[in-house]
Amino acid sequence: MLQKPVQLLLWVAICLLVLLTVYVFFMLDMLWSPFWLVIKTIFIPLIISIFISYLLLPVTEWLHGKGLPRTLSILVIYVLFFGGIGWALYKGVPVLIVQLTDLSENIPMFAETYNGLLLHVHNHTDDWPDGMHHRIDKMIRQTEAFFAGTIEGAISGIRNVLDYFLIAATIPFLVFYMVKDIELMKKTVWYLTPKSWRKRGSAFLRDVDDSLGDYIRGQLLVCLILGVIAGISFWVFGLPYPLILGLISGVTNVIPYFGPFIGAVPALLIAMTISVKAVLVVVITVFILQFMEGNILSPFIVGRSLKMHPVVIMLALLAGGELAGIVGMILAVPATAVLKVMMIHFLRMRTEH
């Protein structure tokens, strides 16, 4: 009778001990920071290479299945992918630095414009509580500080990219050999895995791939298309910083449902300092992009690969946003999909035993 409560207490104690160990580990940052630097230098390129290989492998297999020799199909995808990224960086980074620098210099002007708008609002809302006026002023100041810090960090990161050049240069080579020797890597992992875990482990990874693979690849393609369309639209209608706003729009579209509206906030803030026409252009562009994503791109490219109810996805997005902001919202859906597969396999194991 007491066996289950004792086991439960044991697991709780182990979890608390692990959490305490992690906490102490992070508190002693002076000791582990050199090791973290080495780990970061090794594992970040490795993780990026694994992710890129995961994206490119199905396309390579598709070309190989059409009769193209495997080595040639790898080279074609390799050259197209990294050649396209290289060309985009060569053309886009100088423009991006110019636009970021200009935006950073104009932030005080934008703040002055917003202060004028606030003064106008204050004059027409004298009956509002003073606390509400104070909160609006505070929100504007926090927004200004956030954008200033983000832009300065982006400029600094782009200008210091040479510091990470050697690390980044290893990624194309890692990707090539990962895609080329994928079967050898699978066999190695298979033999290194304990025999009792092999069947369940391969089934778990296969289910995760079935759940996430098409979603991730499709979502990234949708984001690329929407980001390009947004950037071109802002450029055609004369909105400043079209490359920055297009990038923000594309990246935030990774977030289901809320992404287009989050990506529209910077464009709206800038458009408000120009004219009502600019605001209308941004609003219309966002609604067109939202319509394209919901009715054309996502149904055909992404489909219902996740097999999760929209309510579950929205709850996951809210939880991710609360825990880690925008990054949490981006990672929330893939993490929930993996947790769903883990839960299914756990329940299956319980029923088998």
Swiss-Prot record:
The chain crosses the membrane at residues 8-28, 37-57, 77-97, 165-185, 220-240, 243-263, 269-289, 311-331. GO terms for cellular component: plasma membrane. The keyword Nucleus does not apply. It is found in: Cell membrane. Keywords: Cell membrane, Membrane, Transmembrane, Transmembrane helix, Transport. Its main location: membrane. It comes from the Bacteria. It is a multi-pass membrane protein. The keyword Transmembrane helix applies. One of its GO terms (biological process) is transmembrane transport. PANTHER family: TRANSMEMBRANE PROTEIN, TRANSPORT PROTEIN YRRI-RELATED. Belongs to the autoinducer-2 exporter (AI-2E) (TC 2.A.86) family. This is Putative transport protein YrrI.
